[in-house]
Amino acid sequence: MADLQAILDSIHTDILPRIGEGKVADYIPELAKVDPRQFGMAIVTVDGKVYRVGDADIAFSIQSISKVFMLTLALGKVGESLWKRVGREPSGSAFNSIVQLEHEGGIPRNPFINAGAIAVSDVVMAGHAPREAIGELLRFVRYLADDESITIDDKVARSETQTGYRNVALANFMRAYRNLDHPVDHVLGVYFHQCALSMSCEQLARAGLFLAARGSNPMTGHSVVSPKRARRINALMLTCGHYDGSGDFAYHVGLPGKSGVGGGIFAVAPGIASIAVWSPGLNKVGNSQLGAVALEMLAARTGWSVFGD
């Protein structure tokens, strides 16, 4: 394998002059306070080696990247029947679009847009109190990363609860179409807390390693999902993981990935490694501007694109 530390160092050197590009997510008050002049990146290979550069050990709000872990939990609970409640197609619309949801009868286009993730949170609740569902997610992510220090940032969760009017609208829409089983405020309580998961690049890359290793965590030896399910989650990340910038990300980077408005991007090189990058400045579709640039550099310098080198 190429000298990954040297590649990471070269990416960091090339990114440094551009640090601060993009715009932080100012519609969530707590995220508006984050200094955009930060950049971190971590790679964990399937043989357990860890490579990092920059601010890879600083915890940030993973936001929509949490949807990958919630989807994994939901599929574990209800299997393929999940797809009766949420689709598997790219949306082509903004991640918080209401128009599409109404047009399609309350069935969200995919599990990674906000409406789809809210439906997935409803499935994970499975009759339990919000606190129990949040606890289940936190235990799961700590287990995946083998790190008990991972937490949920209550300030961020509160900040989203106070300003998430559009998510309230999406949830009420789905409840009206009978695609939510639990009270709207309970489901949103889970959703806002899952998005407030706080992790570093290294923790995130460790937690997602099972998706690079056919569903098992090679560092612990634990099977998380079947190889088939890991492959399908990766397929969804490739086609739907970056909102209406998913096609552009596939074109430039060519790896399954999931972004979040906290500036993080999680990506998978199947059979090789999991990758996490963080830079808080976002582009116009809500994805980390420099994070995407760094991953494009990584794919070019390693030949890891799933479409060939």
Swiss-Prot record:
Keywords: Hydrolase
Annotated EC: 3.5.1.2
Catalysed reaction, written as an equation: L-glutamine + H2O = L-glutamate + NH4(+)
Domain of life of the organism encoding this protein: Bacteria
GO molecular function, one term: glutaminase activity
The keyword Hydrolase is assigned to this record: yes
Keyword Hydrolase: yes
Binding locations of substrate: 64, 114, 160, 167, 191, 243, 261
InterPro entries membership: Beta-lactam/transpept-like, Glutaminase
GO terms (BP aspect): glutamate biosynthetic process; glutamine catabolic process
NCBIfam families: Gln_ase, PRK00971.1-1, PRK00971.1-2
Similarity annotation: Belongs to the glutaminase family.
Quaternary structure annotation from Swiss-Prot or TrEMBL: Homotetramer.
Name used for this protein in its record: Glutaminase
Organism per entry: Rhizobium leguminosarum bv. trifolii (strain WSM2304)
